[in-house]
């Protein structure tokens, strides 16, 4: 199982770094920060599907 540590999120501003992650909602997030903010917003219902684009 692939996991990402989102314990230090949410962050108010994310960098523009592009290291895509695919969420369980079938959305490609541009980087860990954007993904983790979405995880927090979803109360943990979104999980990491895999690294890279969906």
Curated annotation (Swiss-Prot):
Compartment list: Secreted
GO cellular component: a single term: extracellular region
Chief site of localization: secreted
SUPFAM superfamilies: Kazal-type serine protease inhibitors
Disulfide bridge positions per record: 6-36, 14-33, 22-54
Pfam families, per the entry: Kazal_1
Key words of the record: Disulfide bond, Glycoprotein, Protease inhibitor, Repeat, Secreted, Serine protease inhibitor
Lineage top rank: taxon: Eukaryota
Keyword Glycoprotein included in the entry's annotation: yes
Domain Kazal-like per the UniProt entry, residue ranges: 4-54
GO terms of molecular function: serine-type endopeptidase inhibitor activity
Site positions for Reactive bond 3: 16-17
Entry-listed glycosylation sites: 43
UniProt-listed CDD domains: KAZAL_FS (cd00104)
Domain note: Avian ovomucoid consists of three homologous, tandem Kazal family inhibitory domains.
Official protein name in the record: Ovomucoid
Source species: Turdus merula (Common blackbird)
């Amino acid at each position: 199982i692939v996991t990402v540590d989102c314990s230090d999120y949410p962050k108010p501003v994310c960098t523009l770094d592009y290291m895509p992650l695919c969420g369980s909602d079938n959305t490609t997030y541009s980087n860990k920060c954007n993904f983790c903010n979405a995880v927090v917003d979803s109360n943990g219902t979104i999980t990491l599907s895999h690294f890279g684009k969906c």
